[in-house]
Amino acid sequence: MEASSRLVVQVLVLMLVVQVALSQHWSYGWLPGGKRSVGELEATIRMMGTGGVVSLPEEASAQTQERPRPYNVIDDGSRHFHRKKRFPDN
């Protein structure tokens, strides 16, 4: 009985490992949320031999045009974040 339950557990673990190993290739090149970047999509379409670039839906093209603006770091010379000395200098 113990040998058969051990065999069942080993088969289940093997099935899980095989499933994870075979499904890893699907996640390559995808962004969080299951979205692909536009450049990769165009490259994929060209590789498929369609001969042209497929126009993107209006929602997707609006997202690609909107870029985050860089922020400016302002150094006001404050020493607020400097560590306090534990021992006075003698």
Curated annotation (Swiss-Prot):
Modification type Glycine amide: residues: 33
Regions of compositional bias (Basic residues) in chain numbering: 80-90
A Pfam short name: GnRH
Annotated GO MF terms: gonadotropin hormone-releasing hormone activity; gonadotropin-releasing hormone receptor binding
Pyrrolidone carboxylic acid sites (modified residues): 24
Tissue specificity of this protein: Brain; ventromedial olfactory bulbs and terminal nerve ganglion.
Protein's organism: Verasper moseri
Protein name listed in UniProt: Progonadoliberin-3
Region of interest (Disordered), ranges: 57-90
Domain of life: Eukaryota
Keywords: Amidation, Cleavage on pair of basic residues, Hormone, Pyrrolidone carboxylic acid, Secreted, Signal
Purpose: Stimulates the secretion of gonadotropins.
